[in-house]
């Protein structure tokens, strides 16, 4: 029995999974974790290390479904050919994305019926609470949920290149409401009025014409543009990033923030519960309001070396070592493989070492 991955928005171009958004990145991650896997798509094709198969041709595999709310419907479709469809939910976003009661109930039913793997402890807790509140008690008692922090490819980090003018990053690729882009713009405008900075925002193409993006792009100290062409370029830009200002109200994990921290940027975070899963307790740059955010970001770009020393002290001496111990994607890879083996009896070959593809 093999593995197939389904994400309705995934695009395959020139034999590879295209895009640098979180969904595409995670599909590539799963293909690396399960070599020779399939990707569910509209047209069958052989690609670089994986196959694309239409849903109606999926048979005899564990379907890792990233569109979790659809799993019961997928089960019925697969059941037409397969007497015992095997589906695992992969929740890689915060459950609060579903606000309508019908959507929340559908999510709860899906996670009650099918084993569910989550991208962080916080997400797993929210999933369990949703199932407990929305699903029948006997379904909740039988539900299976596991988690691991997504982590980052530590070997992707590049050597630091400190810029002549400090670079402040908008650490997201969208301008959705929960990211609070207006707060970001308010704070960076204040900081830019006090000291030279270059603010950079790399956004999904559809977001470039949104009002916050247009407003930011009109500032002489700001650059707004599309996502980088490759992961290599992405990490090269992070190596030249001085600081970032996180403003999101809610996150399931915060992969972009972890990557920026691993690259050496000083992160300024809101005082929100999700932040505790990203940085150590006592992290010095957590703000309660816009005034505190301004002061912290100003320090991060004008006294960066001192700020990094504070990060080291908060992490017991070495902030980078703390990050690498807690956000290495090896732990995620091992955990998801273990769950697929335990829940479905799928034999998996051991991963290679640090130089794995």
Where are these regions (language model features)?
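A charged, aromatic-enriched C-terminal amphipathic alpha-helix characteristic of glycosyltransferases
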Residues: 21, 25, 302-353
């Amino acid at each position: 029995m093999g593995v197939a991955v389904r994400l309705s928005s995934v695009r395959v171009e020139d034999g590879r999974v295209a895009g640098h958004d979180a969904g595409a990145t995670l599909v590539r991650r799963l293909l690396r974790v399960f070599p020779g896997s399939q990707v569910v798509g509209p047209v069958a094709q052989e690609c670089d290390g994986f196959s694309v198969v239409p849903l109606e041709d999926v048979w005899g595999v564990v379907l890792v479904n990233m569109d979790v709310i659809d799993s019961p419907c997928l089960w019925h479709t697969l059941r037409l050919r397969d007497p015992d469809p095997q589906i695992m939910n992969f929740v890689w976003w915060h459950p609060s994305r579903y606000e309508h009661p019908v959507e929340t109930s559908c999510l709860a039913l899906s996670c009650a019926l099918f084993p569910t793997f989550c991208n962080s402890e916080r997400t797993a807790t929210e999933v369990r609470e949703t199932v407990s509140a929305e699903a029948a008690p006997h379904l909740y008692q039988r539900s299976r949920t596991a988690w691991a922090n997504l982590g980052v490819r530590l070997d992707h980090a590049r050597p630091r290149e400190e810029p002549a003018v400090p670079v402040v990053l908008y650490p997201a690729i969208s301008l959705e409401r929960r990211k609070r882009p207006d707060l970001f713009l308010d704070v960076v405008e204040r900081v830019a009025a006090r000291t030279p900075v270059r603010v950079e925002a790399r956004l999904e193409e559809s977001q470039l014409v949104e009002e916050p993006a247009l407003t930011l792009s009109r500032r002489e100290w700001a650059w707004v543009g599309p996502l980088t062409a490759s992961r290599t370029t992405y990490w090269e830009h992070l190596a030249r990033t001085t600081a970032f200002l996180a403003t999101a109200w809610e996150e399931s994990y915060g992969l972009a923030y972890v990557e920026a921290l691993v690259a050496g940027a000083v992160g300024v975070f809101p005082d929100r519960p999700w932040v505790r899963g990203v940085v150590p307790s006592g992290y010095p740059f957590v703000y309660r309001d816009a005034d505190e955010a301004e002061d912290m970001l100003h320090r991060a770009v004008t006294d960066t070396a001192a700020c990094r020393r504070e990060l080291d002290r908060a992490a017991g001496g070495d902030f980078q070592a703390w990050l690498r111990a807690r956000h290495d994607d090896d732990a995620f890879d091992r955990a998801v493989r273990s769950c697929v083996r335990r829940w479905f009896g799928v034999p998996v070959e051991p991963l290679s070492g640090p130089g794995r593809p």
